[in-house]
Amino acid sequence: VIKKCFAIILAFCFFFSTALSASSPQFPPIELWDQLNFVPTQEILDYLGIVPEEDPYEVRLIVPTDQVNDSFVTFSPTAYIRYIQEHGHYPSPLRSISIPGSTAQVSDSEVIQPSTQFEGRPNVLHWTGQDGEATWIVNVPEAGLYTIEVFYWMLDERGRDFEFELTINGERPFDEAGHLLLRHRWRDTHAITQDRRSNDLRPPQIPAFMWKSQTLNDTEGMTDGAFNFFFEAGQHEISFRALRGEIAISEIVLFNAPPLLTYVEFRAANAHLPVVPNIFITYEAEEALYKSDAMLFPTYDRSSALTTPYHHANIRLNTIGGPNWQFPGQYIQWVVTVPEDGLYQITFRARQNVALGMQSRRSLSVNGEIQFAEAAELVIPYNHNWVNFTPSDANGEPFLFALNAGENILSLEVVMGSAARTMSAIREILFMLNADYRRILAITGPNPDMLQEYRLDQQIPSLLPNFEYAAAALRAEIALIEAEGGDSGGETSIMERLATTLDMSVRDPDSIPRRLSDLEGAISALATYMLVLRSQPLELDKFYIHSPDAEIPRATDGFWRALWHQIRIFIASFFIDFSVVDQAEEGARAITVWYFGGRDHAQIIHMMATDTFTEQTGIQISMQLVQTDLITAIVSGNAPDVLINAERSMPVELAMRGAVQDLSVLPGFDEVRERFMPDAMLPYTFRGGVYAIPMTQMFHMMFYRTDIFTELGIEPPDTWDEFYEIIPVLHRRNMQVGLPLDQMRAPTMGEAVMVARAGLGIRNLFTTLLYQRGQDLFLPDGTMTTFDQDESVEAFVQWTQFYTHHGLPDFFDFYNRFRTGMMPIGVQPWWWYNMLMVAAPEIRGMWEMVPIPGTVQPDGSINRSSGTTGEGSIILNHTDDLDASWQFVKWWTSAETQARFGMELEMLMGPAARYNTANLEAFSMLPWSLQEQELLMYQWRWVREVPVIPGGYYVARNLDNAFRRVVIFDENPRDVLLRFNRNINAEIARRLLEFPAD
């Protein structure tokens, strides 16, 4: 009886509480909503009688589906795909309209000047500055879509492409017209040579200055072929606004070319040409005439004994392309010579083993013309081995190409072809799903309550229709890729995974919060897949011009040849030191130079030193690529003369022990000092001596999503006070803010040491906040920190409150969260700019880089001081030739050398590897646009270096410990900082006793 009564009471309480909660939902007081970042549900708003503001991210307001779609889930209404949908029904008149370059009206006559004659052509417009605008008047007799072709001569000797914005009648026709490129053409300076170890040396790449023409196209490869621009009949203004580069323009042409012939029509039109018999000519692909990019230099392959030229141990530059030849618009040209006019087959020994399961597409032109439609998109399938690829029709019948007797120019260009359709579809799906994902986050937050029913399908009426559309569109693209011969088991599995997640979400909307992490991962994977799809890598060894009956050499090794090849490589590994890039000749004046880094970097330095430094001074370089600890090498007597990239604290640590040379006493030091920012020598200065010359510097910039900020009606913060104001605006929508926080955690002791040696500069914002208050890290005599002073405590409190009071994440994936919009603003090192430009094409034009927020001073000015980090070049004390070592360091840190190294590095690895030189003049010579340079230089002038003192390593360690005590254990920040400061000062005092001043 007691049990039954107890059960009845419990049941009564349960039903009563349920009814009570249904009638009066539970929520905190309204005045605490902003402080707690509380997002009320629609039920709470209805209960309180509150009508939300009309805000696209205020998902408490139920927006009609059609309005949501128009605002969020499609491309920008001014994107090219929308432009063509609007104007695609207009004809493409088969006519040509020429506009002389010199007829332009210019905004700045000092940088843009007409010329009556230039390099054999009249009426040329010279554009010698990185800004300004030129406008041409054109009369179009017939309305329609026209392709625009520009005839130009590049003037920029640094090899920068000409970037510009195009407007028609004062308006940008579509978004992509805001960033157009006219490319350089490049060539090898000379044939491949060899070093003293019989390894091939890569020839430097230089611009080939000549007249060339290019149609305006999509630099991101989202659209296949040239852009079409709509013109009404009548007079129009076409304007170019320069963003970067220098150029001479002779002519602008509006035209439409007739459609390409099919292969059958081509054969019929060339029936008079014979199929030339008994011809077999081999050409090495690495011996190219011209290339569109400096990245397309000769490379090497030792995976096959059939790759020529061949050597089992030494480096032979015997291929071209690979990962460097993958972006739309990149081309390689060769000169081929045949004995007579006629029809020939062409076969390439090629390999596409980079993008798993993906095809590579190329267009093949002869003497500047694509001879038939099928040659406009040749598809090379994925294969991890070398293959012989002969362009053929769907039935495997090889194509014949018409060549003239004598020299012909053969060109292969990367094209997107049918993949452009998939790229556009994926971009639209990403645009839609990212917006839906942000709306879901605004309701659920990043960590949804699994027991709560969010009713997302009711709060976001467009959500399930969007998911259904996206899943269907993804499966349609998968089917098309499979039909075209793509590998359905490879990269397309990413599309299937996302489609499956969307299907399950549609079938069970209440499961969406549980699938949120899966959805985020699948969307990020699809964005990455778009990058993979955009890349079309292809490596070439050689190609053959031959008659149809010729026997083609096999492309892959037989078993015994491959086995012997691997045996020879294995034996050679016992006798060849692959860490040595090059050795000096015996008896020659020489120094040993170490580089901590990759072989490709070391080879660039060695190549530059050989053709400039050694050529000018006669001093030879023994270049070694090392990963060992320098201190161990010093103790063992195997240290180099010069280490060119010492970590931030290493020079002073070695100077304390008398192991490195004081450079300030050497001749010419004052001149060298002028190459850098005034503060740049500070971390390498110890007791009046300077022990390194700066090589690199890295500092913070702020990145934000312009599209999201515009939708929210907020501006990027200029001060930290404004920064605090936008945090709750973003948090109310469950968006995040990213600040740098690199704690001293590393999987190995060696990596932990490297983190410590990198210094405090950009590991977090503490030094930045400290410097913005006008405070230094240490007392002027370097015997104690300033952490017991009010300004330091205030900086520490502000730093920790970002995480304790404002809830900022301490660990995050900035790249993916910035792409999805989950983290629309962040302070990060400026190299993220290059990463986002290259690796996030789907948000191109939707974000900007600006200086970091500053602290308002008593006089109303804003202090934007920022910490920094970097590397420096040192000379070891034991060097036998101090003069030669000093000459090398001066040469290495000079503007010309640093700029060339940066350019060579970018040629090798692409724009994402933009070099962070510390040399001011060299920085201005790197391929930044004028706007990018101005932004970075503005912040760079605020950079303040952190000095290195005995025991200084203890600062970073204890700051990390203090940070964790405050953020994780909720201790008082002032007490914690003062407590750990005593430990720091004790260690500094101990080290000063160990390394006393003279």
Question: What label would you give each PLM region?
Answer:
Residues 142, 340, 805, 840-913, ...:
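Extracytoplasmic/periplasmic substrate-recognition and gating elements
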Residues 574, 578-587, 648-701, 724, ...:
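Hinge/lid segment of periplasmic solute-binding proteins
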Residues 686-695, 700, 724-785, 791-792, ...:
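Extracytoplasmic/periplasmic solute-binding protein
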Residues 852-854, 903-965, 993-998:
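Long, aromatic- and glycine/proline-rich binding clefts that accommodate carbohydrate-like moieties
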